[in-house]
Amino acid sequence: VEMTEDQQECYADIRQSAETELSKLADSGASEGAMRMKTLTQLLRLRQTCCDPRLVDPDFPADQSAKLNAFRELLYTCLEGGHRLLVFSQFVKVLQLLKAELEAAGLTFCYLDGSSKDRMAQVDRFQEDDTVPVFLISLKAGGTGLNLTAADVVVHFDPWWNPAAEAQASDRAHRIGQDKQVTVYKLITSGTVEENVLQLQ
């Protein structure tokens, strides 16, 4: 996915500010532990910017999120083909944005994150009701142990450092009882830290 110009600018600003902060921290003689924590925090901000800049800047225009635009296109292509989707993100804020997107489009969906109390009810609904085309799932909350064979498309909205966690999430659709071919999509923002995450996998 190619970032929009506004998104590239936002990403470059955050990257520049991260480099400046880390340089200041190093010059101040900070411990290795402090440097590591600061680096992880800055990487997190860059990864969030790749997903949707509104995660770091709530005033950022929604239509300038390249990944959301790409997801929208993929979603409608899949729906037109009669497919049902599992959409994973490690960021609950991303899932909330996708939830708002689906609500605005009038699409029914199931939703599961770490705070969901009705976990099995959501799973049963998706499995049994074929009028529900999308299941939004937090990677940590629903990446293991669920049987979601009603889906034949898996979308990873953002890459995870641990490829095993992604593979386990994709396996939710590959369970016994799956009689369709399952297609897995990974949305990766080109020229960013997401490509580095992919290489580390």
Language-model features, listed with the residues they occupy:
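Conserved Helicase C-terminal RecA-like lobe
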Residues: 1-15, 27-146
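SF2 helicase/translocase ATPase core recognition
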Residues: 1-16, 114, 122-123, 127, ...
